[in-house]
């Protein structure tokens, strides 16, 4: 069951599934092309297929691309680049794995609640690689109240003159 609270119509799950199916149909070799694409710009172009729709007269009309740059980047950050990295590691392709990491560093940082909280603590966030690392720290340490086991949490304790070593048992 999909949650639709505060969901814009253009982001409805049915619409996104239709767009993804259309993308797959329009590009027979999409997966292969994504694996060898050397740039973020090239990966965005693969995702930037024009959208087709049916008018009242059942004629096909080409519309502007179905998703914007920010949505493409979110797809790259959360789906395609991690998959590309995992695929490279599974096939012992060290160059491919490094390329996936390099591409993650070329995408601008996400802007979300978790990242804004890190920035309020003074953490510099420049790239998608930074945001993914900070989200991982948040999910592993902050959400589980494991501050004392986290390097960042320990630094905050030291700044507030809380003895970390006596509490770390």
Kindly give the residue locations of the regions a language model identified.
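Hydrophobic, aromatic-lined core segments that form the binding pocket/scaffold
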Residues: 1-132
